[in-house]
Amino acid sequence: STLTALFAGYIHATAKETGLTVGVVDIDDAQNTIGKMRLFEATQQESLDEEYQVMNISSSEFIENMDFLKENFDIILVDFPGNLKQAGVVETLMMIDVLIIPFEPSKIEIMHTINFFDYYKANIMAKREELGYKTTVRGLPNRVVPNLIEYKDLVANQNEFPIKLMEQHIKESRVQFQRNLSTLISNYNHVCDEFGDEMVQLITEHIKA
């Protein structure tokens, strides 16, 4: 949810230069973090006319809303739950062109990330390829302490890692993110603009490929 809000804020903040519109879909029925955040912030704001749109759509209803989303937004960001158990999550993943997998560079997190990617590659990515869809997947080291040996080992051996890593990583800044995380453009603090730049480049390359 943090990364979704950061990238949505970046796209919206640079919209005058790029002309891109962004819509955020929160399909996490249980936590609904971004959806709840926007509802709360809406009570603190006179108008949301200048804000990007946040939509609470259950994963079981995502596909039937695809036409509306494609017609109204250049970039659609989907905030997923942390597991595949929720109804419709796998089907929604089938619709995703660019998948970013954030993970902490710890042994347990890396193990879970590889297990998820193996499932995704065999059961979702393979089916997308059969149907003629291009898919771009990147791993994003998250909550990184650069001097930790686990992160250094990950970077040093990234050619052996099954998921291609993004060039950027998100540093450990839980307190800063918790204090400043927002869905309102007036609160966007440009803390991860480099991540936003790389994401736009990644999406652009995916479209051109």
Name each region found by the language model.
Residues S1-T2:
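Walker A/P-loop
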Residues T113-Y133, N142:
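Conserved C-terminal guanine-recognition region of P-loop GTPase G domains, centered on the G4
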Residues A87-K107:
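Inter-motif core of Ras-like GTPase G domains
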